[in-house]
Each structure stands twice: as structure tokens, then as C-alpha cells.
């Protein structure tokens, strides 16, 4: 179905950092009568899933755009959608948050949860304090750089790492060179 093919190409163009293809597919969706709010939601998802921690402010841009689209409507919403989609397409990319939460969820689904360390547990009552809850907790802001040397993961998951950030590289000119070189090799 063309509807799904065009939205797929739109998302993949933002992911692939091609602002021109992003605009092409956005224009096709708008001319086909796609709901601008649907497009705005897809752009917000792309901001989190594709850009993520490489430029976390892009999510704020896309949320503001979605709100503006809902308030303003067409035809001016096209400009707001274009700005938000271009912000995603031209931003540095990282799917590290996406991968991190999926890895953590896979562990939880597999039953790898362990016990919350005693020093991290809540202790609002004398009874809970007598169990050792909260004892030995180090308040992060009392330590240099606000990083307290203590174990946060359950013993069963000690050393487990979920978050693996990417390097952010120079963007648009390099990408355009790569895209043009790739186009030439496919002809």
C-alpha cells in the first residue's frame, strides 16, 4: 500500500540523514491528505528513536512542532512539519537509548531482575531501617562530579551495561558526499 510505503520512506530518509528525500516524502504525504498529526507523531518517534542522546533537544523541537500542528492546522502546519522533520534528518544520530531500553527489557522479561541493593531501598519507617534499608547510601551530590562510588545494580546484574553511546561526527556535508557517491555507484 502506497500509504505505508511513503511513511516508511519518510522515516528511513530522516534516519538516513537525507533532508531532501525527507522533504519529498513529506510533500507526498501532505498532498495525499495524510493527517498532519499522524505525521507529527512519526517525527516525534524518529526524534527519540533515531536521534536520541546524540541531540536530545530535537525531541523538544518535535514535541513543540506536534503541539503547534494541532493548534494551527493546515496549510501552515506544513511549514512546522518541515522544520521538525529537517531537524531530525540533519541531526546527529544515536539509537543508543533505543538499544539500551530494549536490552534492559529483554533481561527483565527473561527474569534477570535480582534484588534492589539494601542501601538503595526506601526506609520511611523504623522497621524498614531495622532491616538495613537505606543504610550506607551515598548521596551523589556529596561526591565530586555528583557521582557516588556505590553499586546501583542488583548483585545478579553487577557489571551489566545497557547504554553504549555513539560518537557524534560532522554531519551534513559528509552525509551529502556519501549519498552522492552511493548514488553514482548504483547507476
Language model feature labels by segment:
Residues 16-141, 145-147, 151-187:
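Terminal-proximal interaction/regulatory segments of ATP-powered molecular machines
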Amino acid at each position: 500500500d502506497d500509504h505505508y510505503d511513503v511513511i516508511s520512506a519518510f522515516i528511513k530518509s530522516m534516519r538516513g540523514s537525507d533532508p531532501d528525500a525527507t522533504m519529498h516524502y513529506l510533500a507526498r504525504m501532505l498532498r495525499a491528505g495524510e493527517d498532519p498529526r499522524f505525521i507529527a507523531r512519526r517525527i516525534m518517534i524518529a526524534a527519540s528513536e533515531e536521534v536520541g542522546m546524540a541531540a536530545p533537544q530535537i525531541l523538544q523541537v518535535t514535541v513543540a512542532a506536534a503541539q503547534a500542528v494541532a493548534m494551527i492546522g493546515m496549510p501552515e502546519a506544513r511549514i512546522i512539519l518541515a522544520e521538525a522533520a529537517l531537524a531530525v534528518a540533519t541531526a546527529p544520530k544515536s539509537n543508543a537509548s533505543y538499544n539500551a531500553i530494549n536490552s534492559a527489557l529483554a533481561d527483565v522479561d527473561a527474569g534477570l531482575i535480582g534484588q534492589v541493593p539494601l542501601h538503595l531501598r526506601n526506609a520511611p519507617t523504623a522497621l524498614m531501617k531495622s532491616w538495613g534499608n537505606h543504610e550506607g547510601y551515598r548521596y551523589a551530590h556529596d561526591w565530586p562530579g555528583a557521582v557516588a562510588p556505590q553499586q546501583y545494580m542488583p548483585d545478579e546484574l553487577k557489571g551489566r551495561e545497557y547504554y553504549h553511546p555513539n560518537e557524534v561526527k560532522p554531519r551534513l556535508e559528509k552525509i551529502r558526499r556519501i549519498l552522492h557517491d552511493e548514488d553514482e555507484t548504483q547507476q
